[in-house]
Curated annotation (Swiss-Prot):
This is Bifunctional protein HldE. It comes from Campylobacter curvus (strain 525.92). InterPro entries: Bifunc_HldE (IPR023030), Cyt_trans-like (IPR004821), PfkB_dom (IPR011611), RfaE_dom_I (IPR011913), RfaE_dom_II (IPR011914), Ribokinase-like (IPR029056), Rossmann-like_a/b/a_fold (IPR014729). The active site is at D260. Residues 340-468 are annotated as: Cytidylyltransferase.
Amino acid sequence: MAKKVEILVVGDLMLDHYIWGSCDRISPEAPVQVVKIAKETHRLGGAGNVVQNLLALGAKVSVASVVGDDEVGLRIKNMLSELGAGGGLILSEKGRESSIKSRVMASHQQVVRIDKESAVKINLESELVQKVTENLKNFSVVLLSDYGKGVLSDKVCRDIINECVRLDIPVLIDPKGNDYSKYKNATLLTPNRKEASEATGIAIKNTIDLRAAIMKLKNELNLKYSIVTLSEEGIALFDKELEIFPAEAKEVFDVTGAGDTVLATLGFMLASKKDIKEAIKMANLAAAVVVAKIGSATANFGEIEELLRSRANAEFEHKIKSAEQVAEILSQRGEKKVVFTNGCFDILHAGHARYLAKARDFGDILIVGLNSDASVRRLKGESRPINSQLDRACVLSGLGFVDYVVIFDEDTPMELIKKLRPDILVKGADYEGKEVVGSDIVKDVRLVEFVDGKSTSAIVKRIKDADK
C-alpha cells in the first residue's frame, strides 16, 4: 500500500454550527421568519474544512493553530483528534474567544448567520512558529488557510514561508485582506477574482485585466505559480503564459467552502508529485463535487470518479434513443439519406470500427440497431454478452460516425426497421447470396467486407487460451 502524503495545515480554525429546521410562518413580534428547529449539527470550519478535504482525499494531516481557552476551542481540538488530525500543534490562548459561526437553515436555504469570535492577532506568535518549524521536516506540503482571524499574522506567515523555502517544501496559501506582502516567496496563492482585484488594484473585467493582475501577483510576490479562481469560469494559471482551466460544475447548490476544497486538492496533488496543470484540473473536479452539496463539504476520489463517469455517459447517452425517438427525429430529416445496420458489437474492435465508418459513408445519418443482452444470449449462448447493453451502447456512441444507437430485444431488427424506414441497409459481406432481414422493406442493401481475423469470437478465444 502506498504511503500517505503528509500535509501540514496552518490557519484559523472555526466551528460551523448548523441549526436545521422548517419555516412556514412570520413572527407576530416583527417581520421575520419563525424557524422551528429539527436538529443541530457541528462541523469544522475555516482551516478545519481544509483538513477535512485533505482527509477525504486520503492524506495524513496535522494542524497548527491557536484557539481560545474555552468550550468551543476544546470542542474543535477534540473533533480534530477524533479525525486523527491533531498532531499536538494547536495552542490554547487564555482570554481569546474561539470562532463559531451559527447558520440557521430552513428549506435547504440559509436564513441567517450569527458569528461569535475575536478576530484579533494572536499573542502566541513565537510559540506557534516554533511548533511549526520544529516539525516542518515531517511534511511534503504546507497549506496556510487565512481567514483573517488573527492566527496568520505577518510574523507567522513570513517565518513559516521562509523556513519552507529553506527546506524546499511547497507552501500554498488561501489569502485574506488587501496586503499580500506577508505571503512573499510562497509557492502559490489561490485568491478569487475579487480578492485578486483588491490586492493588485486592477479591476478584472476581461482577460487582459486578468493577465495583468495575475502577472503582478507572481512578480511582486516572487511566486512559483500565480493562480486566480474564477468561480463558474474555472481557474486561471500563469506559469509562463496565461491559461484558463474551465470549471467542471454543472449543478451549484452551495459554494460554501469551495475555496478550501481547491486549496486542499492542489496541496494533495503537489504532495503526490503531480504537475501544477494536473493539480488544477483535479481541483476543478473536486470543487464541482462540493458545490453540488449543501454547506461546507468535501470530495473524495470515489465521488470525483463517479462525476467523470456520469459526464462520460451524459456525453454519449444523447445518441442512445428509443425507436420512437429516432423515428420522430427522422421525420424531420428532409433530403438526408438514413443508413441502418445492426449487430451485437460485444467487444468493439478495429473490424467493427472500419465497418461502421464505411456504412456511414453511404449516407448522412447512421443508425445502429444493437441487440439487447437477452437477445445476445439467445443468439450467442449464456456466456455472452461480455459487455452489458448500456456499456456496448456507450462505446458505439463514442464513435463520431455513429449518429444514433437503438437497443432492440427481438432476435432480428425487423420491427425496428419497420419503424425507422431507413433508405439503406448495410450488412457484412458474409450475407452475399443470403436474404438480409428488412430487404423486403428497404430495397437498397449494401454489403461491406470484414477485416480478416477481426471478430469478437476470435478475441474471446484468445483470452480463454491465454488463461489456460
